[in-house]
Design a protein with these regions (language model features):
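All-alpha RGS (Regulator of G-protein Signaling) helical domain and cognate RGS-like helical scaffolds
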Residues: 1-141
């Protein structure tokens, strides 16, 4: 999940250097959706900061972010990839849960997983889909 959070954080940071509010308005998204995506970006940054601090406090060197090449050429592709990444994020945390032995870390991971699920639901709803179409999240391991 550390690499996933780095990936999501980098994805949003790069996208918001390329796309501004007007770009979203031009393709039919409203300002509220744009602002929600910015809040999601801030959440992803906070997740990275938390995970780095937790890993360092355990005496382990955190994984460094990779170089990424996102298939984003316009707002529509940004929104599509964003929704996919958030869905993967939710299932990745669920898949990692059995490997977390610390109750404290598991609680925080569950909190982040819930936030990732809210991100997914928001994006799906904004795209005209059902926010939570299934009663259970598919586990990624």
């Amino acid at each position: 999940v550390r690499q996933l959070e780095h990936l999501e954080n980098t994805f949003y940071r790069e996208a918001f250097t390329s796309f501004q509010l007007q770009d979203f308005l031009n393709v039919g998204f409203d300002e509220e959706f744009f602002l929600n995506l910015q809040f999601i970006a801030a959440d992803e940054s906070a997740h990275v900061d938390f995970l780095i601090a937790a890993i360092q406090s355990a005496g382990v060197a955190p994984v460094q972010p990779c170089q990424y090449n996102f298939p984003v050429t316009d707002v529509a592709s940004f929104v599509t990839v964003s929704a996919i990444l958030e869905s993967i994020g939710t299932s990745a945390y669920l898949g990692a849960a059995p490997f977390i032995s610390s109750r404290e870390i598991l609680t925080v991971a569950a909190s982040i997983m819930a936030t990732e699920g809210l991100h997914t639901s928001l994006q799906r709803s904004s795209l005209g889909a059902i926010g939570a179409p299934n009663p259970f999240v598919t586990v990624s391991t």
